């Protein structure tokens, strides 16, 4: 097949399984090194070789986390996708710190799919949070095994040994991890009970976690050009493909194809009609050529006529009107909270506030367009692509190819941006089916920017209705929050949906954030699934998912309530962050609950001198505080945005963003800051600059000539601070996005008295608000 360009940082290896806490841990000599990993408790007394073959049946397979070579090199195996966030470095810090590794000898390896890794997904700001406990235990077990064998080689006992920087020392003698591997025979199987008793380092003894001096392990490869992204993958003899896209995402059928003009283009080979048994890809035509430039030109020259699907005339307004219809219908939906007394409180209320908030469709627009290389080799289909949810697309690929899942393997690469787009691996399907149609010949499918935007799994337009009831003394007695949008998890991963209090499944990524941490009396949260949205496009998970738009409604509404009650918005929030009842929080993930959110609010008030700073005319601060991404794993954020509004043009200029974060233990300080900066700028982009509109069933924008995300010239000053903490680390890839939009919306009101309830905010909206007084 020829030499394949693959991305590797370190040696080849393997990784995890699902219920990690129920696994034992294996240490075994293997070949020229030592492997470390978790194993099923039923096999904890056995030693298994590392399986470097294609996926097997999964029986009694260890889940391998790291290896130590005779030269002392330590390879940490990573199942999370690297898309600019340096996740490999963060996770390697955890295991290396606990094992007392020499950081200069640590390497990271991004593994390919195999059943032994269990759930492979990178999203939801989960990676560090999900890996923290298991990698600390893995590091502790590795350290223990090295000390045990090191003590034997030094002629002493483990209790007389110390270990630091990959060196075991005792009685004036020492031996390195590498020499222990080369000269000894480390082999120890830990039962789950033993694992639970292994001593873990206290925060005061950590050398790598939280160390701001360490550099990301993947920077050299990314800066010297040796890092390989999915778009770089190639093999000898492959054909290049580009899809000809139908007029609707679903239901379009090819009536005729004319390739007369395409045949005139040098390098054109043929076209293929894609028939996808999974029905994810409908009505696509793939053009094949000897070069990508030829594929682009031939696709443009190809003439295809379709019978379009039923949503050919659907608009953004139609979808939002459908959302309103669903909200106004008391039947249907799923209740996440449904306290007793909500209807009674509204029925007897002295005053009711009732507002609607809407958010537009937003595209991912990642730098690297979606692409995939597919071919069959020895009866197995290999798919080479960057992807965020390998475990989700593998069964779909198997269904599309009509082969067992064991006959499909996904090779991992760096991602030139993900932001949730590559959680949906639909772009691999036409490449795989094209290869199958050619008898397994390699096909490299690359979507152009326009292709990628046309069938992006973008953020659904949404409608929120927020109501609050007050008694005669103006005390809050109840809150009713409802939101309607397309459900990405419902469309692509139904098994991952949670159950509401009424026992019905719902998409937590289409309502999270509405279930906030404020004390508001009787509280009801209802999620509604916009069926018209899902018929029109494939809703996707976009960075910050629902908290990126639910927070717009919740936090802007709370500011409106504060102003109505003539209270300072920050002090008003503090009154509601009592940390009582369900908002108390629980160990280990939400320790402190709303009281930690309140602490973030207080610290930021001090930091920005809230309410005491004199600013020029039409310039003001606004605030928002959130607990993204989910109640089960909250990152406590608060943002103060300072904006200036030009009354003559309606242009809003964000001058400064001040963000305070309590994310528990910060594992990688530089990465944490970079993630928060990027997330905040993403939030700024979505509130002031970026959105698309659905016209005739499709996003109207196809490139940067009309799609206008944040530019460098519009980037404000940023001041980001993390509260010191030794609690379990939470996510950082998305929470910073959630607070910026509402903080800016509230700042606009404070600057010029215009309350805007649609995101994004456009100059015309500001001018209209000014004109209406």
From Swiss-Prot:
Keyword Transport: no
Protein's UniProt keywords contain Translocase: no
Essential cofactor(s): pyrroloquinoline quinone
Coiled-coil parts of chain: none
UniProt modification remark: Predicted to be exported by the Tat system. The position of the signal peptide cleavage has been experimentally proven.
GO molecular function terms attached to this record: aldehyde dehydrogenase (quinone) activity
SUPFAM superfamilies named in the record: Molybdenum cofactor-binding domain
Alphabetical keyword list: Cell inner membrane, Cell membrane, Membrane, Oxidoreductase, PQQ, Signal
UniProt topology in membrane: Peripheral membrane protein
Known catalytic reactions: an aldehyde + a quinone + H2O = a quinol + a carboxylate + H(+)
Protein name as annotated: Membrane-bound aldehyde dehydrogenase [pyrroloquinoline-quinone]
Organism, as annotated: Gluconacetobacter polyoxogenes
Lineage, broadest ranks: Bacteria, Pseudomonadati, Pseudomonadota, Alphaproteobacteria, Acetobacterales
